[in-house]
Amino acid sequence: MSKKLVAYFSASGVTAKVAETLAEAIGADIFEIEPKVPYTEVDLNWMDKKARSTIEMNDPASRPEIAVKRDNMKDYDTIFVGFPIWWYVAPSIINTFLESYDLTGKTIIPFATSGGSDIGKTNERLAPSCKGAKLLDGKVFKHSVGHKELAAWVDGLKL
């Protein structure tokens, strides 16, 4: 049995709830991807062209710093990476996270939360950050998803 990690970034707590439920459902360790400079409500105002999140998402080279790295990443074979959908893709802090480790031989599985957006071009944007890893297709979940649905999704991946 491979060792699994659920790593997630959550701006509002919704993705954190789904990540915790997923980790419990599949018996995985959990790790929160925290920005070195926390996002404020003003930073997250997607309607403001000068908001931090808007500026980051409009710059493909943007890599927001992460507060803490996971020390034992080498111990994991499978990494579920969770995040809210921003502008139809993963927030750029997810690229920062993925690029911070040697992912050679690991399986990366994105999962996202959104009130209405689909996964969009997430994998296309994440693939360059997953060098040497197998990147599986991601899935979007509503905040109300339960253990049973998450466990069934993971079973269907045939890891």
Predicted regions and their residues:
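N-terminal beta1-alpha1-beta2 submodule of the flavodoxin-like/Rossmannoid cofactor-binding fold
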Residues: M1-T78, Y88-A90, N95-E99, K148-L159
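A structural micro-motif
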Residues: I26-A28, K106, A133-K134
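Short, conserved loop/helix-junction motifs that constitute active-site signature segments
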Residues: M73, E99-G105, S129-C130
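Glycine-rich, N-terminal phosphate-binding loop of Rossmann-like dinucleotide-binding domains
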Residues: F83-P84
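Acidic catalytic loop of the alpha/beta-hydrolase fold
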Residues: W87-Y88, G116
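Short, glycine-/small-residue-rich phosphate/pyrophosphate-handling segment
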Residues: I109-V145
